[in-house]
Amino acid sequence: MDDASRWECLHPDLVRLIGWRVLAGDLLDYVRFRAVCPLWRSSTVCPRGRGLVDERFHPRQWVLLPEGHELLPGHSKLHGYIRFFNTSTGLFVRARLPLFEDHRILDSVDGLVLLLQERDSAVRLLHPFTGDIAELPPLTTLVSAFAAKSDLSSGWDLADFMKFSATSVSVSAHGVITVMILLSRLWHVAFATSNGDRQWCVSSWSLSPTWRSVSFQGRLYILQRCRYNSDPQILQIDPPQHKEIGPPKLIATCPGKIQPPYHLVQCDTDVLAIGCSDKPNSLHLLVYKLADLILENFNPVVTIGGNVLFANTERSLSVSGRALPTMVGDTIVKTKPRDKHLGEYHLKGGTWLPTIDESTCGFEPSTGNLISRIFWCHYNWDKNEACFQRDTTPRLVKRNWRDEV
């Protein structure tokens, strides 16, 4: 019996167990695993049809990455293809998603894409690799729901309800999908489920005007400072129960030595809070684990597992250092304090280095290199808007990785 035949004769229970181990690493590796032979395919669970309702199949390591050069999702030159980037391995895949021909992107979370149909404002949650879709209420119902709770609703239009600070997706034991969205311009949280909901619901409470947010394990986390001289607080918003979303729960307080601008970012299995040191004229950054803050351990970390954090004012993202060979691990990419230029802050040494693409002139974000596109990726999902927001930020990374990938 040759080696190939031995693999084909594995017991189905063992194949299934190996498959779950592979899936814990990456969904697309699991798809390739199932394609090895008919036995392996029949012994493992097919992700199609379960891509949304079974959270094990959520492609969390994959982020939607625009092509650059103003080729936004839905552009005719892309022929329906969208590029995704694996934040753990650095691999790219292109998926053909015909829905983008008449849909626009509202947000993306855990590798899933929240879409708005332009014709009737229907909202859909899409799994880009299995094609599974969950139908959610039209976005126009969110406008009416907010109008019922706010006397100021007459000053808003639909565009104000399309700006999200964060989105979370959770799945109940019965397979009901709940989507929570944090409305950045309205300071409220809205939610809807896939269980036949006909309209979005809006929280009866609101947040303070300034915050940083992140989605993690189906919950929303908020970092905010209520007053100028108060310590920043971290709040947790749980999925709604019985059609009502409870107020944010205070779960941790950051020490006063962390100063704005703040950032929250999911990094591996942790949520990290980033801020500036309060020492006079200091350019140092401080990073705290949420788990440590909950235990009132206020010692900043000196390593982030070799990852690179992209701390943007809109969204922050963690990428494995293995996926970015031109970058040094344990680095934070963000605008320098008291400066509008992007820099690389090396956490272990406490030093800043410029991240400038010396071949370019001016301060527009580059559309041709990977690091720049990762940093700005949440600005350029929408085919109906400009590819990049104007900013005084120079281009990034070294000459040998400047070209389109």
Please describe what each predicted stretch is:
Residues 245-337:
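Cytosolic regulatory protein-protein interaction regions
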Residues 94-285:
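A sequence/structural signal of beta-propeller blade repeats
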Residues 57-61, 88-89, 105-112, 168-177, ...:
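Short, solvent-exposed coil/turn segments at beta-strand boundaries
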